[in-house]
From Swiss-Prot:
It is an enzyme of class 2 (transferase). It comes from Xanthomonas axonopodis pv. citri (strain 306). Mg(2+) binds at residues 219, 222, 224. This is Probable lipid kinase YegS-like. Keywords: ATP-binding, Cytoplasm, Kinase, Lipid biosynthesis, Lipid metabolism, Magnesium, Metal-binding, Nucleotide-binding, Phospholipid biosynthesis, Phospholipid metabolism, Transferase. Residues 1-134 form the DAGKc domain. Probably phosphorylates lipids; the in vivo substrate is unknown. InterPro entries: ATP-NAD_kinase_N, Diacylglycerol/lipid_kinase, Diacylglycerol_kinase_cat_dom, Lip_kinase_YegS, Lipid_Phosphate_FormReg, NAD/diacylglycerol_kinase_sf, YegS/DAGK_C.
Length: 309
């Protein structure tokens, strides 16, 4: 039997990771044909995935954070083949927040993460397809808007490197006095809501922005996206909620959130609305978000909380 052929796509910011280098060597000694490609600029992940598909690679491994995972997943989804014919997807978490990996209980250590990919059969997983003014996008984890999105977009890269997830909290605290509500209309099957909101989560996965569990019950294999809308609140209540949400206090979120679970959602806003798609901001007045069932296959832990079984 021919050895398994993998293509690891590494975020260029993590080329100095010695643990990953050693782990790659270990997997090669175990008989896996493992090639490494490093991203340097926009479009590299798309190109590397295209080459992997053309080369008949069995598994594509994203080595990086949530943005790298989403880039690689999107590049796979752009191909016409279904999940069974495309390479499976694996993840070595090397980012600052690692929101998807945390919610999925994936191991952080590179050798453990690569070993899991080798040992676990890939499972069908959904992706979110987002249609907006500037063409279609794909999202593997969470699309977010409002307060949490501004925190993520504005968090300094140097601060993230030094402080990890704490950087998001510090940035969030600095914004508490200037939370501006956004007005929009949301509609989906048997769901409609219109008004001003300060935070929004559209979840294939559960958390984003450095640990904000906006969609705590979301599953990535149910064919549905979880919707969480935090309506505008007045005065100090809004500031307090912002602190609690950023600090991961889910009790505060549960008291005020509007929730739904739908296969698709339309969002219409009179003003430009920015959604953070796994770290990539996209601005539009109209979004259509669709959960595409079983778009890819992914290697995940046996008791992964994101799988419904």
């Amino acid at each position: 039997m021919a050895p398994s052929h993998w293509r690891l796509i590494l975020n260029g910011k993590s080329t100095d990771n010695l643990d990953l280098r050693e782990a790659v060597g270990t997997l090669r000694k175990r008989g896996i044909q493992l090639d490494v490609r490093v991203t340097w600029e926009d479009g590299d992940a798309e190109r590397y995935v295209g080459e992997a598909v053309a080369d008949g690679v069995h598994t594509v491994v994203a080595a990086g954070g949530d943005g790298t995972l989403s880039e690689v997943a999107a590049a796979l989804a752009h191909h016409e083949g279904d999940a069974a014919t495309l390479p499976s997807l694996g993840l070595v978490p090397l980012g600052t927040a690692n929101d998807f990996a945390t919610a999925a209980t994936l191991p952080i250590a590179p050798l453990e993460a690569l070993t899991l990919i080798a040992e676990r059969v890939a499972q069908p997983v959904d992706l979110l397809r987002i249609d907006a003014d500037h063409g279609p996008h794909w999202c593997a984890n969470v699309a977010s808007g409002g307060f949490g999105t501004q925190v993520t977009v504005e968090t300094d890269e140097g601060l993230k490197k030094m402080l990890g997830g704490l950087a998001y909290l510090i940035t969030g605290m600095s914004r508490l006095g200037r939370i501006d509500p956004i007005s929009a209309r949301f509609s989906g099957p048997e769901f409609s809501w219109e008004g001003e909101f300060i935070a929004l989560g559209l979840g294939n996965g559960r958390q984003a922005g450095g640990g904000q569990a906006l969609c705590p019950e979301a599953l990535i294999d149910d064919g549905l996206l979880d919707v969480t809308i935090v309506p505008d609140l007045d005065g100090e209540v809004a500031a307090t909620l912002g602190t609690l949400v950023t600090g991961g206090k889910q009790a505060a979120l549960e008291r005020v959130a509007v929730r739904a679970r739908v296969p698709w959602l339309d969002i219409v806003s009179q003003q430009p609305l920015t959604l953070n798609l796994d770290g990539e901001p996209e601005t539009s007045r109209h979004f259509r978000i669709e959960c595409v069932p079983a778009r890819l296959r992914m290697h995940l832990p046996g008791e992964c909380p994101l799988l419904g079984g």
